[in-house]
Regions:
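Short, well-structured N-terminal submotif of metal-dependent ribonuclease cores
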Residues: 1-37, 50-62, 104, 113, ...
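A generic structural signal for short
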Residues: 12-13, 48-49, 85-86, 100
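Phosphate/NTP-binding elements of NTP-utilizing enzymes
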Residues: 45
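Active-site neighborhoods of divalent-metal-dependent phosphate/nucleic-acid chemistry enzymes
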Residues: 57-61, 66-114, 125
């Protein structure tokens, strides 16, 4: 299983927050499991930090580099797939994560019930 962390799951992981489910922790820690973080997640965090709506590591780039997570860029194919998704959910960051997960066959680690409205594999965070 290849994982894609949504923003909340990533923040819970980085903060070692007990809100992250044991199943999600086990899957993220599993040796040999590729874990991806989207460029969209970094973008969302930086925007929300600038607005004072979110606390996250001051140097997210260093925190990600210290992890074994792989960075997932946003491609043209991802962007086009996001635009074609049903309009169940209008959050652009979530829509790109859903498109990336579908396109790259990733399981999204999320605590957002809106993701269940899409044809995407989910591991409940």
């Amino acid at each position: 299983m290849n994982l894609l962390l949504d923003t909340q799951a990533l923040l819970w992981w980085l903060a070692d927050d007990p809100a992250l489910t044991p199943a999600a922790r086990t899957a993220i820690r599993a040796a040999g499991t590729p874990v991806f973080v989207s460029a969209a997640t970094a973008w969302e965090i930086s925007i929300k930090q600038a607005l004072g709506k979110l606390e996250a590591p001051d140097n997210l780039e260093a925190a990600l580099a210290a992890s074994r997570f792989q960075l997932l860029p946003i491609t043209v194919a991802h962007a086009l797939a996001a635009g074609r998704l049903p309009r169940h959910h209008d959050d652009p960051f979530d829509r790109i994560l859903i498109a990336q997960a579908q396109y790259d066959q990733l399981t999204v680690v999320t605590h957002d019930p809106q993701f269940r409205l899409y044809d995407v594999a989910i591991l409940w965070a």
